[in-house]
Amino acid sequence: MLLGSSAGGHLAGSLATRFTEDVYSPVDAADRQSARPDLAALLYPVISMQADITHPGSRAALIGAAAGPSLVDRYSVDRRITDDTPPMFLVAAGDDNIVPVENSILAYRAMLAHGRSVSMHLFETGGHGFGPNLPAASPASRWPDLLLAFAAAHRLLG
């Protein structure tokens, strides 16, 4: 299982959608093993590089603020989802003022369009960067248990 949040969610989503790409010449047998994760858990992730949806700082750092359409497509996780993308678990909060929740929705829709297993949990509140640190009374505090249940449903837990 692979987990990433915010910009780390983009990294995790990229690995989940680009694991077949050759990024270096193999040195030994380990380099020939699949890099496909069994499950990708993305928390309030940066998914899209589209200027009106992305986190501007992430886009500027990764592809540049003035990047053209081909770079936007290449680095937008939702546009890289295929029929081979592993199951995906998404968590976001509607009041996230850092990474628009539309990012998670785009990933969810793309997973459905490719018939992939996906579980999205969109909470009313939680903001950005909450991780496992929310008060127990907050509905978003349940995401770790929801992730474990999703992983168990995919037989990834003992």
Regions found by a protein language model. Name each.
Residues R36-L39, T85-P87, H114-S119:
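Loop/turn elements at helix/coil->beta-strand transitions in domains of secreted/extracellular proteins
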Residues Q50, G57-S70:
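Mobile, glycine-enriched helix-loop/loop "lid" segments at the mouths of ligand-binding/catalytic clefts
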Residues M49, D95-V99:
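Acidic catalytic loop of the alpha/beta-hydrolase fold
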Residues V91, V101-G158:
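C-terminal catalytic histidine-bearing segment of alpha/beta-hydrolase fold enzymes
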Residues M1-T54, V72-D73:
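Primarily recognizes the serine-hydrolase "nucleophile elbow" in alpha/beta-hydrolase
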Residues P26-A30, A65-R80, T85-P86:
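Active-site nucleophile elbow and catalytic-triad environment of alpha/beta-hydrolase enzymes
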Residues R18-T20, G57-A60, L106-A110:
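Glycine-rich, phosphate-binding/catalytic loops in enzymes
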Residues D84, F89-A92, D96:
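Short beta-strand/loop motif that positions the catalytic acidic residue
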